[in-house]
Amino acid sequence: MKHCISKGRMLPVLVFILTACQQVNSPQNSGVIHTINGPVKVDKLKFTFTHEHLMSNFGKDPDEAPQYDEAALLSQVIPYLRKIKSLGVSSIFDCTAAYFGRRVDLLKIMADSTGIQIVTNTGFYGAADDRYVPEFAFRATAEEISKIWIEEFEEGIDGTEVRPGFVKLAFDDGMPSEIDKKLFRAGILTHLSTGLTLAVHTGNNPEAATEQLKLLTQYHVSPDAWVWVHAHLVEDVELLLSAASSGAWISLDGAKESNVQEYINKIDRFRSQNLLHKILLSHDGDGFPMGGEIREFDAIPRHLIPAMLTNGFTEKDVDQITVRNPKEAFMIRTRTTD
């Protein structure tokens, strides 16, 4: 991936943007998150994975009404979710977006069958060379797009009473495209109207992160309303520490058994800067990837947490990252700087 701005120059740019922001929270819907089964107080979230896919058709053609072998899907995913729940997990944020597999009716069956609180999303996925961005979005304004997402928040998704708990967006590699920036502006407008947090697939792309932070500043929205998704891919941890120190949420969402030590080392960098309160952990797993076998999402409770506890982290540290941080990151409220 080529970048036109060096990472050495990117860090002061991020610092300049972020230090200009001072967060002001509005009381709108404060203390609440929308789950598949309705609004709940954030205190009920408990141990939470903030970036998983319970099913997806990612890789297939875009589809506004995705089809699955529902019997096969449910017979595979529900037992696995029961296993996840037995490991102490109470809540999962499902990041499968519209046009590549979101089906809130199936998510409700999963939630009702397992007791896991599932949170779905609104928004469009702008990565994968914009493959899953609907054609009309290229012609529409940011305001017109935001109205669709705000309507899902106010009225429900796909004719149901299910409302989104966050906005899912994504940037391609390299310099941000016009459609990616427009979708992000639509996301900001949605946040200002609804208080939903913006979870944005950004990865190891400092240019995209900087552009997003510039736009947040232009609209007087705090970085605390923004999650840097797939941040574990970022090579320069100083960029993440800089973003976190000014309020942004850092999603380390590629955990697996084979990278436990890498995760411990990275988390320890945040601890050394008193920034454990800005980390989110997950796996980016998938319960039914294009109808295939499960891409598992159990490494955090089975491998990472035990290793953390034998490497100097405390139960309080683990609770901060897996319980308290998701509540604070996704509690519905507008977060502005004026």
Regions found by a protein language model. Give the residues of each.
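Active-site beta-loop-alpha junctions enriched in small/polar residues
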Residues: 53-55, 97-98, 123-127, 172, ...
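Histidine/acidic-residue-rich catalytic or RNA/ligand-binding cores of hydrolases
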Residues: 58-62, 104, 130-132, 208-214, ...
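Active-site gating/metal-coordination segments in enzymes
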Residues: 109-112, 117-119, 123-193, 249, ...
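Short acidic/histidine-rich active-site segments
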Residues: 199-201, 253-254, 275-294, 318
